[in-house]
UniProtKB/Swiss-Prot annotation:
Disulfide links within the chain: none
UniProt xrefs under InterPro entries: BipD-like_sf, IpaD/BipD/SipD
Source organism phylogeny: Bacteria, Pseudomonadati, Pseudomonadota, Betaproteobacteria, Burkholderiales
Main location: secreted
Protein name as it appears in the record: Translocator protein BipD
Entry keywords, A to Z: Coiled coil, Secreted, Virulence
Annotated compartments: Secreted
Statement: the UniProt record of this protein carries the keyword Manganese: no
Keyword Zinc in annotation: no
Pfam families: T3SS_TC
Source superkingdom: Bacteria
Gene encoding the protein: bipD
Function noted in UniProt: Required for invasion of epithelial cells, as well as for survival within host cells, escape from endocytic vesicles and subsequent actin-tail formation. Probably regulates the secretion of effectors BipB and BipC and their final integration into the target cell membrane.
Organism: Burkholderia thailandensis (strain ATCC 700388 / DSM 13276 / CCUG 48851 / CIP 106301 / E264)
SUPFAM superfamilies assigned to the protein according to its UniProt record, in alphabetical order: IpaD-like
Coiled coil: 127-171, 250-299
Length: 310
């Protein structure tokens, strides 16, 4: 197997299955320069931290409940711990910074030196995979920045909805053991505030807009200039289901409304969970890419040294 040729093909095509297979095979072919999972963690690139914290936001969001009546007894709802969402955003940004720093260090310390040794300045034709590595590193940095920005924005949105769901407790009460009172107008205002302040994210310059539209699906919309906007349809359905202030419903009608309203909340949760899964997949791709790149850089460095010894 010509690992270098296979590597070039996989990187050029961004064939992540092939890259993953090469990442497994690379230690057997590339020598001591190949990076390991422990090396990644030592460099601060530990995907487990942001993914665990994002998972905690999903669990926290899922645990939020509205008040209800059970057998004539009023049961208070459950509010969200909003600090969980702040922790997740910090972890995502820190992880992205560590990923970018690793790529930039390689680009400066290794590929820069390889270009100097094997580039046109030395009269030597560089290895054909070299430019692919430079391009892939640039694309890797772009993807890292884009995913971090989008996941941070979605987490902020998630937090805003969790905040509204928590504040609903203040506007729903029991009128008696058979009826619930809802100040729907006040709740509408809270939801409208979220709609009016939905985060907007900007994809990096030169990003493949069509690829990102396919990647992110209909939970967001992406303009031709790369502005990512969250789809407000689910929030609008929640807002429009609410009655005026002071409305009194019997428990059956209230429960029917609660089920539909909470169903839209669950749909928002599913959107965010899908993105978190894609973020996890992107992190896996990054780890595999790093392992392949480290083997390629090690090979290119050895080749450059051999040229200098001629």
């Amino acid at each position: 197997m010509n690992v270098q040729v296979d590597m070039g093909r996989a990187l050029a095509a961004r064939d992540w299955r092939a890259v993953a297979a090469l990442a497994v095979a690379m230690p057997a072919h590339a020598g001591a320069g190949t990076i390991t999972d422990d090396d990644l963690r030592a460099a601060g690139v530990d995907r487990r931290v942001p993914e665990q914290k994002l998972g905690a936001t999903i669990d926290e969001f899922a645990s939020v409940r509205l008040p209800e009546q059970i057998d004539g007894e009023f049961v208070e709802g459950r509010r969200a711990n909003l600090a969980v969402f702040d922790d997740a955003r910090v972890a995502v940004r820190s992880h992205a910074l560590a990923q970018r720093n690793l790529l930039e260090r390689w680009e400066t310390e290794h590929l820069g030196g390889t270009l100097d040794a094997a580039g046109s300045g030395g009269g030597i034709q560089p290895d054909p995979i070299l430019q692919q590595l430079v391009d892939v590193i640039a694309q890797g940095k772009s993807d890292v920045d884009a995913y971090a920005t989008i996941v941070e924005g979605l987490t902020k949105y998630f937090q805003s909805v969790a905040d509204v769901m928590s504040k609903l407790q203040d506007y729903i009460s029991a009128k008696d053991d058979k009826n619930m009172k809802i100040d729907g107008g006040k709740i509408k205002a809270l939801i409208q505030q979220v709609i009016d302040n939905l985060p907007k994210m900007q994809l990096p310059k030169g990003a493949d807009i069509a690829r990102w539209r396919k990647e992110l699906g209909d939970a967001v919309s992406i303009s031709d200039s790369g502005v990512v906007t969250i789809n407000p349809d689910k929030l609008i359905k929640m807002r429009d289901s609410l009655p005026p202030d002071g409305t009194v419903w019997d428990t059956a009608r209230y429960q029917a409304w609660n089920t539909a309203f909470s169903g839209q909340k669950d749909n928002i949760q599913n959107d965010v969970q899908t993105l978190v899964e894609k973020y996890s997949h992107q992190n896996s791709n990054f780890d595999n890419l790093v392992k392949v790149l480290s083997g390629a850089i090690s090979t290119l460095t050895d080749t450059a040294k051999s040229y200098l010894q001629i």
